[in-house]
Amino acid sequence: MSRLTAEAISLSFEQRGQRRAILRDLSLGLAKGESLVVLGPSGCGKSTLLNILAGFQKPDQGRVQIDGRTLEGPGGERGVVFQDDALMPWLNALDNVALGLRIRGLGKAERTARARQVLQLVGLQEYAEQSVAQLSGGQRQRLGLARALAVEPDFLLLDEPFGALDALTRERMQVLLLDLWKQTGKGLFLITHSVDEALFLATDLVVMDGPPARIVKRLPVDFARRYAAGETVRSIKADPEFGRLRQALLDEFLDVAEAEHAH
């Protein structure tokens, strides 16, 4: 089974004449079929870690590998979805999805067929000819997911993809993401500062603090697998164990914040 790993990653940059550490000797990994969610406050290094996994930034030390092969930059085995959808506003939905396939050398008929296939997967088949400006925020994020899925990556890397959405749309997108995860068997790497989102979407949850980024806690979570097995969202979120873990994680963040304030 394909596995994506970050091994002893460190990164720092110059600030006012001094080196500032963002990541220090950080290691983690996930396999296809798993959903690794990194939960942490803004500014702790989550997005930097995702950018390194995606190949957009190079670490000062350490390496990113898939199945033992060191990665030197972006690649088709990793699809990326951002909070800012980064769509091409002058293209319609279908052409936004097909663009990445064109760059990879697919012929017009093949890329159009593939683009329509993934638009159907995310429920946007009726909006294929619509311009980006005509789409709602939730539809734009669906389109971002479709574009990432079109190149058939083994792993989806998602940088707070639902953070700008209203609460109801956000929950619908979480459910869609788990539906796609169940259907495709891809590995998910998602970063968020929402405790509820992390608990619902993760099979493995990493709590991060920083900078420099450090892993405070790792724990296995079974709510995503329970949803994939047919349990309802309402039943999962009404489970006392969901509430207990939610409160424990919130308490952990409060403890860290109070300790920092004391210093």
Swiss-Prot record:
Pfam families: ABC_tran
Membrane topology note: Peripheral membrane protein
Domain ABC transporter stretches: 4-235
One GO cellular component term noted in the UniProt record for this chain: plasma membrane
InterPro entries: AAA+_ATPase (IPR003593), ABC_transporter-like_ATP-bd (IPR003439), ABC_transporter-like_CS (IPR017871), ABC_transporter_ATP-bind (IPR050166), P-loop_NTPase (IPR027417)
Origin organism lineage: Bacteria, Pseudomonadati, Pseudomonadota, Gammaproteobacteria, Pseudomonadales
Major site of localization recorded for this protein: membrane
Protein name, UniProt field: Taurine import ATP-binding protein TauB
Keywords: ATP-binding, Cell inner membrane, Cell membrane, Membrane, Nucleotide-binding, Translocase, Transport
Enzyme class: translocase
Catalytic activity: taurine(out) + ATP + H2O = taurine(in) + ADP + phosphate + H(+)
Organism: Pseudomonas aeruginosa (strain ATCC 15692 / DSM 22644 / CIP 104116 / JCM 14847 / LMG 12228 / 1C / PRS 101 / PAO1)
Task of the protein: Part of the ABC transporter complex TauABC involved in taurine import. Responsible for energy coupling to the transport system.
Complex and partners: The complex is composed of two ATP-binding proteins (TauB), two transmembrane proteins (TauC) and a solute-binding protein (TauA).
Residues that, per the record, bind ATP: G40, P41, S42, G43, C44, G45, K46, S47
Record family assignment: Belongs to the ABC transporter superfamily. Taurine importer (TC 3.A.1.17.1) family.
Record's subcellular location: Cell inner membrane
GO MF term set: ABC-type taurine transporter transporter activity; ATP binding; ATP hydrolysis activity
Enzyme Commission number(s): 7.6.2.7
